[in-house]
A protein has these predicted regions:
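Envelope-exposed proteins and targeting segments
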Residues: 2, 9, 32-34, 74, ...
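Short, glycine-rich nucleotide/cofactor-binding loops
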Residues: 12-13
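Periplasmic OmpA-like peptidoglycan-binding domain that tethers envelope proteins to the cell wall
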Residues: 16-18, 39-118
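Short amphipathic alpha-helices and their capping/turn segments at secondary-structure boundaries
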Residues: 22-29
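Short connector loops/turns at beta-strand edges and beta->alpha or beta->beta junctions
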Residues: 30-33, 41-43
Length: 118
């Protein structure tokens, strides 16, 4: 499936992202014993605190959308990391920084790690 991206300073799921979330939900529902960490990211613009909050809201928005598609809540955890893994500088053009405003979907197989994630 394609990547889920967000518009600058937004947490709303775009129509394109909604289509991708549909695809992800279908994949997740094939094996409900798996666990997924949904990580929200931001670009480098803005304060660290603001970006942490924004990235958490983005991750929460995707988790909520997946739950609405029937994915059990017990399969999902959301974590925001702000701009910790952004690659483009805050002065880069918006078209480049867009690549940092993303969601990372990770299968978690280590249950000790899963239980450690808040």
């Amino acid at each position: 499936f394609n990547n889920i991206y967000f518009e600058f300073d937004k947490t709303e799921i775009t129509p394109k992202a909604a289509t991708i979330i549909d695809e992800i939900a279908q994949i997740m529902l094939t094996d409900t014993s798996k666990k997924y960490l949904i990580t929200g990211c931001t670009d480098a613009k803005g304060s660290s605190q603001y970006n942490m909050e924004l990235s958490q809201k983005r991750a929460d928005a995707v988790v909520n959308a997946l739950i609405k598609k029937g994915v059990p809540n017990k399969m999902l955890k959301a974590k925001g990391v702000g701009a910790k893994i952004s690659y483009a500088s805050q002065n880069a053009p918006n078209e480049i920084r867009e690549g940092d405003r993303k969601i990372i979907v990770q299968i978690v197989t280590n249950m000790d790690y899963w239980n450690y994630i808040p």
